[in-house]
Amino acid sequence: EYLKVLGMGCGLFNQDVLGTAMGFWLSSPTSEDVRPIGQRIPDENQTLWLFTTDATPSTHRMTVGTRVSGLERGQYRFVYQDSGLVNRRWDEVVSGDVYCVALQRQTSFHTFDEVSRAALLVEVGPDGMAMTVEAIAGGKCDGQDFSFSGAEQIFYR
């Protein structure tokens, strides 16, 4: 909200919503890194950022490095749904279910693929401090029984 006070329209930068998928995720638990916060500079290839922007209020976005097998490094988006386990807002993806998101890849600064490039399975851990994901290249979010195949990866707050 502080950006609105400044008259900037891009929205809040810190979008970590505890207990949900929304926010910035790292490849290792932050409690293992005891250096002062100013010295902790994560490798962007090892991160996952799930967020929204004021510019496109009906979509949520994801920026990913090279760590998620099956996804090219870059930014993705999806039009969110208000119910079910498919394409839910990041801040509504909570512990207890495996969700599926159909991702459209960014192709230039202002454009994205018209159809989804991959499906992303997402499960938030019980305490909200870990999240399991698996990308399925060319996959779709068909059906309602989503389960991991063994190629999943864990990210941490």
Predicted regions and their residues:
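Acidic, glycine-rich catalytic/binding loops that coordinate metals and/or anionic ligands
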Residues: E1-E44, A55
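Beta-sheet ligand-binding and adhesion/scaffold domains
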Residues: F13, Q81-R157
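Short, hydrophobic/aromatic-rich segments at coil-to-beta transitions
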Residues: G19-F24, S58-R61, V94-V101
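N-terminal glycine/threonine-rich, aromatic-flanked beta-hairpin/loop signature
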Residues: D33-V86
